Amino acid sequence: MTRVALTSAVNLAKKLHDAGIRNQAVLKAISHTPREMFLDNALAHKAYENTALPIGQGQTISQPYIVARMTELLLHKMPQRVLEVGTGSGYQAAILAQLVPQLCTIERIKGLQIQARQRLKRLDLHNVSFKYGDGWLGWANRSPFDAIMVTAAASTIPEALLSQLAEGGVLVLPVGEDTQQLMRITRTGERFSSETIETVKFVPLINGELA
C-alpha cells in the first residue's frame, strides 16, 4: 500500500468515525485496505470518497459507510464462520477477512469472482473460500454460519439463508424493491427476530449464475 493510499485510507476511516462508525476493528480494517485496488484505473481517483462506484456488469462497490456499518452489525457477536452473498469487487470480503477467522463468499458473475479472488490473494488474505453460484441458495455444505451478510437487495428474505444460520447467528441484509431497509435478523432456535437499521440503496439480488 503506497504512502498516499495509506494516508487516504486513514482519512476515510476518520470520516467514517465522524459519521457514526464506532467499532475500532472495523475502522482499522478500512484504514489498511487499498480501495483503489478494487476499481478500474479510471475511477481510482475516487477510491476514498464515501460513495458507491460502478465495477461493471451492472454492479457497484458499496459506499464505505455502508461497508463499515454492515460489518459493525455483523460483528456484534464475534462470529467465527461468516458467509458473504455477493462478492462483487471483493472489497467487502477484504474487510471481513481481516476481522473473522473464516469467510465464505459467493458470486454469481464469474468475471467478478475471478477478479476478487486475485485481489484478495495479492492482499495476502488466505482465510477466504470462494464459490461461483446463486447467492439465493447460500452455501449449504459449509453451513451453519455464525453470520451471513448479503450485499445486494433481496425482494424477500431468502429462506435458504435463514436455514443456514447457526443458533444465535445473525443475517444482515437490505430488503426491498427500490429503496430498501437494512435489517439484522437473529436466530433463536427455530425463531427469528428482526431489527430495521436504516434506509439504504443496493443493486438487486438476482437468482441464477452469469458467466
UniProtKB/Swiss-Prot annotation:
It comes from the Bacteria. GO terms for biological process: methylation; protein modification process; protein repair. GO terms for molecular function: protein-L-isoaspartate (D-aspartate) O-methyltransferase activity. Its main location: cytoplasm. It is an enzyme of class 2 (transferase). Keywords: Cytoplasm, Methyltransferase, S-adenosyl-L-methionine, Transferase. Gene3D superfamilies: Vaccinia Virus protein VP39 (3.40.50.150). The active site is at S62. It catalyses: [protein]-L-isoaspartate + S-adenosyl-L-methionine = [protein]-L-isoaspartate alpha-methyl ester + S-adenosyl-L-homocysteine. The keyword Signal does not apply. Disulfide bonds: none annotated. Its EC number is 2.1.1.77. Belongs to the methyltransferase superfamily. L-isoaspartyl/D-aspartyl protein methyltransferase family. Catalyzes the methyl esterification of L-isoaspartyl residues in peptides and proteins that result from spontaneous decomposition of normal L-aspartyl and L-asparaginyl residues. It plays a role in the repair and/or degradation of damaged proteins. This is Protein-L-isoaspartate O-methyltransferase. It comes from Shewanella baltica (strain OS195). The lineage of its organism: Bacteria, Pseudomonadati, Pseudomonadota, Gammaproteobacteria, Alteromonadales.
